[in-house]
């Protein structure tokens, strides 16, 4: 997903008070009654709200071209909320709304437009509270305690559609074919759009649109829809509705296939860290029944147990999968953490901003690359030494990049709070249960623990055991590394207490935590080392890195590590710095099935390519890991991705980025190039006991 700058909408307001797009010279909704127009064209045109009652699944998926002011979405949400209130026992429990918008509105313009419909005010306020920054790609927004999922894709719809993952194929129940009139926005209304709509629509799915233009009708028919002309809204004589009678088969990348779980009513999560807790909650939002097993006496005893951790995105200026993922992950994490705080979930934190310093030529070059993209200043901004120092409260000694929405939080506090919340929602927790063996027996997974503990059986299992992930037979070949890290806890001083934001250099230093009057400085990075003992050398190294990176100023001399307060954890790292999330791949079967994958793709006929089977995985076995040093940033989104995959839902990233998160990616990349796959990676050997 290319992080091209997203241009926001430029509006004017006509005499009727209707917003007008300066880009397209067209109104956003009817001058007569925008709300009634939405009901007539899009809801009634697709058979809603009456269709809610007969919908056979727990989730109903809508897609829209042109989010605009959000009027269609808000109207649908209001009608769905009324339906749920009147029919609490209905099968349908959740809405998933996917919308594409080339020119997103400023939140102030949204508020002005929403003011026309006081009956939608409570819904509109919730939307505006989570309105995302103008960043390219998908913004997943969770509303109504997870009953509403909104995927806002910012960018040109016809640029985005070819990048979408196979998880969107044959999924959409109803299309709101909106956007400005074909005469005003001719680039959108084309064959590519109509074909993509058909590919994404499930058999029996519908569409409606305000236009009755002949080329639109013919294009939709050629794509596979049955199209009907019906009475338009107000003075408009006709509009189009239609149904897709049969499934449209589309080309896929089966080697990166993401299977859903067969059963979500009996899921075991192995692990006691932040990603385990977030995954449990993401599954529970969808109705899953979850049991958690943790080797320790309480949660957050591993890498999630630190006092303070920095939250900021990982950028590299390459517009690649890594930058796409961490841009989405960071913004999603902030939205989710803010929602938790609003719900009264308490954890130490400060959204004080993060500054990444250009402390030498190498770091300066990296930051210059990061800034090649024209980021919104609310997301990332180049700053001089003077600007950074003013924000930080201390002389930063260098120029750098500032992340105003970043900050720090207490991973230990957060993990404990999330576990408590998941338990309140029905999760069963078993502590001091260290998994020894995982075996598939009679279509279930048998979990074997210590000698005095009975084996457990579950339909579906998620492994979230951090650096221990490669210990099991099924995950032994994954190229994961264990990396020891020691964080030093240093007492504040009158000078250090002036630090107002997180500083990142060849390490990091946090502002003082008011709860304990200490800062955190770290962290060491010892690859292949899983020991968690205190080490004086690493304590001193944490201090020395700060002194070495900021030699021009004297205040770092205030850092005192002599009381030897520290905490050591072990990260689970991957050489490409991206997490692994999805079904656990079957290593032996992958190599056997795909040994000639490159030849079949490059030289095989169409039928041979179409016959390539989906990637082999262990049945009902999933994983999330490899979060490295960025778990606070990545954990919320990878948990959401895994839960959505397991429930067979659309995923909130493009196909290229999702492929880069697939646990089989290293093997598949080599096989696609016709290169041999090593039996085991040295990185894996380092992390095994």
Swiss-Prot record:
Do the record's keywords include Flavoprotein? yes
**Record field: catalytic activity:** 5-aminomethyl-2-thiouridine(34) in tRNA + S-adenosyl-L-methionine = 5-methylaminomethyl-2-thiouridine(34) in tRNA + S-adenosyl-L-homocysteine + H(+)
Organism superkingdom: Bacteria
Task: Enumerate the GO terms in the molecular function aspect.
Answer: flavin adenine dinucleotide binding; oxidoreductase activity, acting on the CH-NH group of donors; tRNA (5-methylaminomethyl-2-thiouridylate)(34)-methyltransferase activity
Any single Gene Ontology cellular-component annotation: cytoplasm
InterPro entries registered for this protein in UniProt: FAD-dep_OxRdtase (IPR006076), FAD/NAD-bd_sf (IPR036188), MnmC-like_methylTransf (IPR008471), SAM-dependent_MTases_sf (IPR029063), tRNA_MAMT_biosynth_bifunc_MnmC (IPR023032), tRNA_MNMC2 (IPR047785), tRNA_S-uridine_synth_MnmC_C (IPR017610)
The cofactors required by this protein are: FAD
User: Keywords, A to Z?
Assistant: Cytoplasm, FAD, Flavoprotein, Methyltransferase, Multifunctional enzyme, Oxidoreductase, S-adenosyl-L-methionine, Transferase, tRNA processing
- Entry's EC annotation: 2.1.1.61, 1.5.-.-
* One Pfam assignment: DAO
Q: What's this chain's function? A: Catalyzes the last two steps in the biosynthesis of 5-methylaminomethyl-2-thiouridine (mnm(5)s(2)U) at the wobble position (U34) in tRNA. Catalyzes the FAD-dependent demodification of cmnm(5)s(2)U34 to nm(5)s(2)U34, followed by the transfer of a methyl group from S-adenosyl-L-methionine to nm(5)s(2)U34, to form mnm(5)s(2)U34.
Protein name in the entry: tRNA 5-methylaminomethyl-2-thiouridine biosynthesis bifunctional protein MnmC
